[in-house]
Amino acid sequence: MPADQRPLAIALMGPTASGKTALALEAAERWNGEIVSVDSALVYRGLEIGAAKPDAAMRAAVPHHLLDLRDPWQVYSAAEFAGDARQAIAQIVARGKLPILAGGTGLYFRALLEGLSHLPEADRAARASIAAEAAQIGWAGLHSELARVDPVAAARIHATDPQRIQRALEVYRISGRPISYWQALPPGLRLPVRVLKVVLAPRERAVLHGRIERRLDAMLAQGFLAEVEQVRALPQMRAVAVPLDLPAVRAVGYRQAWEYLDGAGSLAEFRDKAIQATRQLAKRQLTWLRGELDARWFDPERDRHQLERALVGFLGDRSAVRQASGV
């Protein structure tokens, strides 16, 4: 079988506060790279301090992609991310540079590296109608309906799982095809690059927790709450009926800050809630990352030499690329 001749890229994955940004910058400077953000908070304008967005100096030193794509009252889907990321990667490769995918949003990584199924978008009216029917006949009755229109999905979905029953019926009603049809379609196109997956994660949970606390305190000292107040004051945000439903506001830290500024609890209670929410996010991220069986794990502090050897072994000597691109 012929060797994979696709250009190389690296994916720097890991829980929040694990050091991905610093490593991405180091790798970009050493191997002539450009950074593609894989972070669902960094796509929103105005989310700076609380999202740990790369500052102007970092962006001047290394080109960054997929930052500040939407306003905080707008929505940005994983499918949109995958399309934008593919375009950015192709442009980086065309310049003879190394794409460095850095972030911790698992859904974005899956959409890009594995592809998404072609499921229709959610439909609020259809969901409301199904919920009203459930109130009348129960979810078991709706499961029976699902068994008639999509026996394959009904066999996988338990009669006591209302969320999945609702979604399966919603897809059928708005598309005319069962959800099992959509899920059987090929998920997406092959990436034009060969990717080394690197996971940065401290071996000891206490170390990661300490990093999370220190980072939040630094954000507060830099004016995080004032930043959230500025976002809240935007006319478009004030016009939103339920701001806490917006993806930008649901970002970890921002939701807790929003609730605090709404008058929920003391500053100390906000800090505790934000730290706890960030720890829970890190736990979810680690659970997802353990499923990435082809990824290589490194402790960001203990495994520096092993990490460097892994990167050098994969990337080799890219000095010729630097010379060709004039960098």
UniProtKB/Swiss-Prot annotation:
Query: Which positions does the site annotation Interaction with substrate tRNA cover?
Result: 105, 127
Cofactor section:
Mg(2+)
EC assignment: the record states 2.5.1.75
Q: Which Gene3D superfamilies match?
A: 1.10.20.140, P-loop containing nucleotide triphosphate hydrolases
Q: Which residues bind substrate?
A: 16-21
Tagged with keyword Hydrolase: no
Please cite one Gene Ontology biological process associated with this protein. Answer: tRNA modification
GO MF annotations, alphabetized:
ATP binding; tRNA dimethylallyltransferase activity
- Per the record, the coiled-coil ranges are none
Q: Where is this region: Interaction with substrate tRNA?
A: 39-42, 163-167
Name the catalysed reactions. Answer: adenosine(37) in tRNA + dimethylallyl diphosphate = N(6)-dimethylallyladenosine(37) in tRNA + diphosphate
Residues annotated to bind ATP:
14-21
Concerning InterPro entries, the annotation shows: Dimethylallyltransferase, IPT, P-loop_NTPase
Q: Give the protein family.
A: Belongs to the IPP transferase family.
Task: Briefly state the protein's biological role.
Answer: Catalyzes the transfer of a dimethylallyl group onto the adenine at position 37 in tRNAs that read codons beginning with uridine, leading to the formation of N6-(dimethylallyl)adenosine (i(6)A).
Q: How is this protein named in the record? A: tRNA dimethylallyltransferase
Q: Which organism is it from?
A: Xanthomonas oryzae pv. oryzae (strain KACC10331 / KXO85)
